[in-house]
Amino acid sequence: ILVDTNIIIDALANREPYADDAKRIMEKCAAREITGILAAHSIPNLFYILRKNFSQEERRFLLKNLCEIFQISDLNEKKIVAALENNAFSDFEDGLQEECAVEAMADYIVTRNPADFKHSRVKVILPDELLRELEKN
């Protein structure tokens, strides 16, 4: 499951009303109940975005832990060019997320912004929907 950057922000920055579901997803990844994937470019984005919530030292610690919890889908020329050529995504970063999900053979992209991924080749799911789906299995 490729986890969109906004889910990680929700969990780490404790953004309500989204934090609980985001934390549960991260816990399932940490417990290896599901395979969580982060796109490599999410790491520097998180480092920058979380500067309002955490010191540099805290961010380094948190992001290092994320690298232990999640598989990191690397960013390479092939993915960058494919995302640039994919006009289905108006947001280049979302196109990169989708390319990482495709190459990692992810079953889902979990995000709070499914409209951003309406043309995704990978099924897109909201956090609460993912948690309900996991409870069924």
Enumerate the language-model features and the residues they cover.
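Alpha-helix capping/helix-boundary segments
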Residues: 7, 42, 79, 97, ...
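Acidic, PIN/NYN-like endoribonuclease modules and their adjacent C-terminal/linker elements
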Residues: 102-137
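A secondary-structure boundary/capping signal
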Residues: 4-5, 39, 113, 127
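PIN-domain endoribonuclease scaffold, especially VapC-family toxins
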Residues: 23-90, 95, 99
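A residue-level structural signature of the nucleotidyltransferase/glycosyltransferase Rossmann-like core
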Residues: 1, 35, 72, 109, ...
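Short, well-structured N-terminal submotif of metal-dependent ribonuclease cores
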Residues: 1-37, 51-61, 119, 131-137
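Structured loop/turn residues at beta-strand edges in well-structured enzyme cores
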Residues: 3, 68, 104
